[in-house]
């Protein structure tokens, strides 16, 4: 396994694979890796000849008062984990390598689907994601890229970006990795206190109860109200509880496929989760 820190070095490492037309898979991360990230790499190994994982804490997707400065940088630990699952190349650039010495002048904004959910409470976040992912796609030039479904809205933004800009990359969403008690794996789970960690699985438990109620014919508005109530009663400060079509458009009257979304703070830690629901016709 190689580790490259410059664009030039990565290009040189990938040129032999490109000339022999090998399939390049790409997993973009911000490091502080957990089993969810490693599942993305495992999936990439199944489908691709060469797997590149980027580790870059992207400053322009963090808003004011968010945790950019405190976000864990664990490159040595991450490298050991990636070697164990067969990663071929780590790309770990500096901020200067990615953005130069001057403020960026180009912005990329994916309209409509970034207007609500996490986009409403984190203004500019998805623009920052769109810029860094586009840059990474142009640097790595993968055939396939892998993203987790926990960040469902982000996955939708990336799919739209690739479609609108005619990027020749297949985007694969990988199911949410969960701990034994259902909590969606996240690098930010490490911020939770021991007591908060005991409460955190309430999100997934409440989503599963909401799914059960929908199958029983309970009205969606009532299901969402109870979901929010349960989370608030458990000690969460709820950002949003919503339901959308799989393409993130508002629910129409006869939609049978939908996605339930939760974003809530527990103490100082913001947690997100979602659950895809298929109702019987």
UniProtKB/Swiss-Prot annotation:
This protein's GO CC annotations: cytosol
Swiss-Prot/TrEMBL catalytic activity: (R)-pantoate + beta-alanine + ATP = (R)-pantothenate + AMP + diphosphate + H(+)
Record's keyword annotation contains Transferase: no
Chain residues that bind ATP: 30-37, 148-151, 177, 185-188
EC supergroup of this enzyme: ligase
Pathway(s) the chain acts in: Cofactor biosynthesis; (R)-pantothenate biosynthesis; (R)-pantothenate from (R)-pantoate and beta-alanine: step 1/1
Active site positions, chain numbering: 37 (proton donor)
Swiss-Prot/TrEMBL GO biological process terms: pantothenate biosynthetic process
Enzyme Commission (EC) number: 6.3.2.1
Gene3D superfamilies membership: HUPs, Pantoate-beta-alanine ligase, C-terminal domain
Binding site for (R)-pantoate: 61, 154
Known function: Catalyzes the condensation of pantoate with beta-alanine in an ATP-dependent reaction via a pantoyl-adenylate intermediate.
Similarity annotation: Belongs to the pantothenate synthetase family.
Remaining remarks: The reaction proceeds by a bi uni uni bi ping pong mechanism.
Subunit details: Homodimer.
NCBIfam families: cyt_tran_rel, panC
UniProt protein name: Pantothenate synthetase
UniProt source species: Acinetobacter baylyi (strain ATCC 33305 / BD413 / ADP1)
